[in-house]
Amino acid sequence: WHTLGKAIRMAQDIGLHRSCSNWDLPPSEIETRHRVFYACYVLDRLMGARAGKPLTILDRDFDTELPVAHEVYDDANDATPAGPSIYHSFIKLIKLSEILGRVLKALYA
């Protein structure tokens, strides 16, 4: 629980909770930032539910976009592989975690 809290604070310190789409960053770095933030988001909700603790990341406190459902490359010549990606499942997990967060807020508010 404490380690996750430190990870979330570090993510917030480097601005992972803020939209970076207009920043001058390579597409792969932007996508990595989104994925790392949402990994913290999902873990925050799962650990909060398991431990009965309040959420650290509130939905109103971030504006970063959802990750995309495919691999992102900096080189336009790299082809996106055919078939489903693991990121489809990750996005569904994020959406379920959002619902879990609302349930936890209702339970513990």
Predicted feature descriptions by range:
Residues 1-87, 98-109:
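Acidic, Ser/Thr-rich, low-complexity intrinsically disordered regions in fungal proteins
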Residues 90-93:
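Basic, alpha-helical interaction scaffolds
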